[in-house]
Amino acid sequence: METVGEIKTARAIAIILPKLAHAAVAVAGVTAGFTAAVSVVTVLEGLWARGRLLAAGYTTESVSTVDDFGSHYDGDRLELTLLGDSLAVGVGAGSPEATVGFLLAEGLSRTARRPVRLRNVAVVGSQSSELVEQLRALEDSEVRPAVAVIIVGGNDVMHLQGIPTAAKYLAHAVRQLRRRGAHVVVATCPDMGTVRPFFQPLRFFAHWLSRLLATTQTIVVLRNGGRAVSLADTVGPIFRQAPRLMFSTDSLHPSALGYARAAEVLLPSVCAAAGYHRDGGGNVPHRIYRKGGRYPLAWFAFRASREAGTEITPAHDRHGRPAFLSGRPAFLNGLSLPNRQHA
């Protein structure tokens, strides 16, 4: 037999539940309305940005290039391949020599003291889903790169591409490249919230969507055997402090200085992927993430996505089990530092 208290509780629930249902519907409606509004604004911003690119003389066609570096060095040639979007192409750099591809190939050649062939199959305006076509172009060339660098994510944010979908295509690309014997370095999505032409609240929305995508990219890259390097700093504090210097004239892409900063962050990881360390230094100490430890993988990846030039790579524990993930500031490669670890 029910007590008076139980009856009152049941009645209260009967009264509250419909109100909660109505409130949920109202919240869902507001959320849907906000999402729709952001979607419309984002699409308009994307069309506007595309118009600026076309007006500046950029196209959405492939600009596949092949260049050789360090021909005066002896030894077998290293194959370096770039895939991705306009950042991989070098839109806004002003000259081929200032693009991230040229800077990485030149730096790798000097570090390895071997000739390097750079093959760039990136396409301006590409989203993660279009990596499939770039992989096909690479397969048609029958090239097996030693190191492949992927720079993608900004257009996924601009076009509100679903994060799971973007991650699926990136994971596929990393798997395919690994099967071809390449070591893969992925520059995770930059913070699109720092692009000045975007207005609030779109800038705030782009900021958090960029972080979520970068976190997801880090996880899927690790799970498929690649290296993930945060490029948040390429449009981070230094871009806020000196936008006229770090952004190109279109205010959307990095300038030559901006690309130089990106290459500075990426180069140590590219060299390490090829089996070389810069400046003759030893191994850099790793911050360790332990599976089942205090923080989940998603938290660790999110923290990495917020730190300038942080590289995350798969690692193993002292028993050889793949239970760890290790990260290090990419720009610290080659420096002799005390050997310390953080759980």
What are these regions (language model features)?
Residues 180-182:
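A short helix->loop->beta-strand "cap" motif at the edges of active sites that frequently abuts
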